[in-house]
Design a protein with these regions (language model features):
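Signature of dsDNA virion morphogenesis modules
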Residues: 1-211
């Protein structure tokens, strides 16, 4: 199964806590401002791009324990985010609008990832090709807001209400099939799907995140 998640829309509290989701790091004097406790000044300095690329530090997603499930009913546990965030680097690319079928058409790469334990979130360092991602680069230089969304493959998900494990939505239990994100009074909880084994393969700039 493929899951899509947009932090600004799906986890509004994450945006409130962070203040800013995306930061362009173009010069040496931007490094301190763009760093965090997870994506440190040293990490940014070690990953400065060549002249043909630009670098962005962004927040990809937050842990479910702190920020809840998203509007699709997907819950991303802290333990899974800690364990699998590096798949953004090993399997992922920087795309536009989730056109992620062909890595050759990617706008760039994910250079580094980190789990910020203090802030309960995954942070990424991406390099964009200044020609392929010219639009994104120009907007970032102008200080315009850029929205990002991620995609992940999961071998299954688990209903938090009854524990049913499904490899496809056709095998969902009654809670996820008809009551996703709804309160289930007999269990005194909201129904959502736990994704505890994600492979993150796509971080995309999206124009209309709410679509």
């Amino acid at each position: 199964m493929i899951k899509v998640h947009h932090p600004e829309i799906d986890q509004e509290e994450l945006l409130k806590a962070a203040g800013r989701i995306v930061t362009l790091v173009e010069k040496e004097n931007h490094i301190k401002e763009a760093s965090s406790s997870a994506v440190t000044e040293e990490l940014l300095r070690d990953n400065m791009p060549d002249d043909d690329h630009f670098m962005v530090h962004l927040i990809a997603m937050g842990d479910g324990e702190n920020y809840g499930q998203n509007r699709n009913g997907d819950y991303w546990p802290k333990e899974a985010n800690q364990k699998y965030h590096n798949t953004f680097v090993t399997k992922g690319h920087f795309f536009r609008e989730h056109n992620n079928r062909d890595p050759e058409k990617a706008l760039g790469i994910v250079k580094a990832s980190a789990h910020n334990d203090d802030m309960s979130r995954i942070e990424l360092v991406i390099h964009g090709d200044k020609k392929k991602a010219e639009e994104e680069y120009e907007l970032a230089k102008q200080g315009k807001a850029l929205s990002f969304s991620m995609s992940a493959r999961v071998p299954y998900d688990v209903c938090n209400v009854c524990g049913n494990k499904a490899t496809k939505s056709a095998n969902y239990c009654e809670h996820l099939k008809g009551r996703m994100n709804q309160y289930v009074p007999e269990f005194q909880k909201f129904a959502y799907a736990i994704n505890d084994k994600p492979t993150f393969f796509d971080i995309s700039r999206v124009v209309n995140p709410a679509d």
